[in-house]
Amino acid sequence: MKRALLLVPLVVAVVVGFAVVNATAKDKPKVKHGNTIHVIEHATTDTIDVDAVGHVLTFANDVFDSADHAKVGSDQGYCVRIVLHHSWECNWTTFLHDGQITVEAPFSDDGNTVGAITGGTGTYRNARGWMELKYHDPQGHEFDFVFHLHGGPGH
């Protein structure tokens, strides 16, 4: 009888642990090996007349494959000037044929940055990860977006 009473708390602990794990795992991205997508943005609409803290820059540009030959989608978003002549804080969506990827990232006037992938649609639904934003040319007319994805179907 004593042995049976000692097993009851153990069984209850296992059941509660199982329930907690299942409840917290619901709708979480399924992390697999990950996926990297590399596109090149042609920044043709990024213009601002007066540069001042708090100013908003909006954009809508085409994105090309990693060889910079074929158009594979577009992007749109906005940036707010945070530090004059130095940095912006940006939010944008990149539209590809199989879904969208949304990013929140700083943008530096004079160097590469890294941002957070905050979600997506289609194939990129539930995706998370990070994105490298690199100057493709020194003039800032083209930028490499390298998405490092995990989570979501097939990622």
Segment roles from a protein language model:
Residues K26-H155:
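Beta-strand-enriched cores of mature, soluble protein domains
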